[in-house]
Amino acid sequence: MSLSDADKKALDASWKKLTAGADGKKNAGINLVLWMFANVPNMRAQFSKFNANQSDDALKGDAEFIKQVNVIVAALDGLLQSVNNPGQLQANLDKLAKSHVNLKIGLEFFGPLQQNIHSFIESALGVGAGSDEPKAWGNLIAAFNETLKKA
């Protein structure tokens, strides 16, 4: 699945909005991961370097949780920086898919993420369900899931 020009534009604009301000990427990452814990079944069980069953406030103060957030943000940032270069985007998707296959994290997690990411984007950006941003994020996760199926 390739991303449309509208997807690319919406992804770029929304990532800039999500990560704006002091500690923007860190805060966006924390919000996304906490949202995933609440909205993707069994997601908390996938993390062993920190106690993912702590309260959200405790997680925000957990150094290992923050390290994982930084890893996730770096991977997302790499994908988003490459959306206008199809070859680089595919290479980044391949690398990310292989790392998740090695960790035995597959479509049972990324399928629900694809289905529900729109609600995170809508809430975080204050946009409606029919807006380009939620659609674009769903399409990005769909592209990842297609790559994950082949990994």
Swiss-Prot record:
The UniProt record lists the keyword Metal-binding: yes
CDD domains, alphabetized: Mb-like
The keyword Transport is annotated on this UniProt entry: yes
Pfam families for the chain: Globin
Binding site for heme b: H100
Domain of life: Eukaryota
Keywords: Heme, Iron, Metal-binding, Muscle protein, Oxygen transport, Transport
Occurrences of domain Globin (ranges): 2-151
GO terms assigned for molecular function: heme binding; metal ion binding; oxygen binding; oxygen carrier activity
Gene3D superfamilies: Globins
UniProt similarity note: Belongs to the globin family.
Additional free-text comment from the UniProt record: This molluscan globin lacks one of the heme-binding histidine residues found in most other globins.
Protein name: Globin
